[in-house]
């Protein structure tokens, strides 16, 4: 099941709950950061793509997205990536050099003209904000990078 909620002004969360037998459930989150150049952080699970896209459309028209920030390339983060890139020719992906390499091994390699390579410590300047890539203190994938938004902290 995929739902959405507003976490803070200008930030919506799209959360998919995956049931894990005998262990409970796992929340898989993506985020929409609204602004002059809207950003989708991660794109949901491969298995839940249709549900994710329906919920995303309730938050923002995918044609209005300008960026996708891939925190990392695990399958629970790239599920709707190909569909979004196909539907929106102006959409660009922010990821690391290693992220591009890993995607090149998948059935959905990234076209380099639609990628902005960013590694931890580097900053992406958008129309209304600056995003500085940060490596979280704990992660399960060595290419994981979130960001610090200079507008929201």
Ranges and model annotations:
Residues 45-47, 74-75, 136-140:
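Short beta->alpha connector loops
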Residues 90-93, 109, 153:
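Alpha-helix capping at helix-to-loop junctions
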Residues 95-144:
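Metallo-beta-lactamase
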Residues 48-94:
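Active-site metal-binding motif and surrounding structural segment of the metallo-beta-lactamase
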Residues 1-4, 119-121:
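Intrinsically disordered, low-complexity boundary segments flanking structured domains
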Residues 2-58, 145-153:
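Conserved beta-strand hairpin/beta-sheet module of binuclear metal-dependent hydrolase folds
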Residues 7, 87-89, 110-111:
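Short, structured coil segments at secondary-structure junctions
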Residues 39-42, 67-70, 133:
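Short catalytic-loop micro-motif centered on adjacent basic/acidic residues
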């Amino acid at each position: 099941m995929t739902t959405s909620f507003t976490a803070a002004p200008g930030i919506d969360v799209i959360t998919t709950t995956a049931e894990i037998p005998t262990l409970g459930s796992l929340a898989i989150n993506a985020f929409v950061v609204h602004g002059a150049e809207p950003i989708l952080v991660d794109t949901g699970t491969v298995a839940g793509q249709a549900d994710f896209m329906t919920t995303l459309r309730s938050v923002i028209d995918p044609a209005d997205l300008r960026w996708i920030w891939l925190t990392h390339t695990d399958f629970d983060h790239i599920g709707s990536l190909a569909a979004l890139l196909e539907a929106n020719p102006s959409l660009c992906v922010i990821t690391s050099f290693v992220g591009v390499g890993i995607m090149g091994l998948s059935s959905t390699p990234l076209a380099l003209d639609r990628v902005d390579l960013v590694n931890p410590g580097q900053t992406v300047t958008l129309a209304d904000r600056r995003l500085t890539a940060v490596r979280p203190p704990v992660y399960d994938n060595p290419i994981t990078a979130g960001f610090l938004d200079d507008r929201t902290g």
